[in-house]
């Protein structure tokens, strides 16, 4: 059974490809690994994307279900002061952008460069793909900035956790 993540699905990433869901072979082998380790080899294919999906979905769930006043406490990260609420929002925004960029960069390459006919069909069926492909500037500088912000989002998450556990 393929895992479903409501928050990742809201980004427009199809369930069939996020996480390790794109791998369908060796089911018995994966079941044994899940029994032994609690996860299987699909989770380590692309660890940065697996972590991004985990962080994004958990921060969204925290934001949706938090009963605390997250504006009262603040953390300092990279010389800036963030309330917990601002930090969570910043993490969600930048991690979501990293996930969308990775997914849509693959789509851009596949559906614009390699298979333009399939790309036209995909754009008709999935408006999010069409909008993103039309509006996004495909520059290497964007990729490095998005990746840097994702790395900072991970650091900010650690900073929040240190504050919460102390």
Language-model features: locations:
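N-terminal prepro regions of secreted peptide precursors
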Residues: 4-137
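Cullin-RING E3 adaptor/co-adaptor recruitment helices
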Residues: 131, 138-164
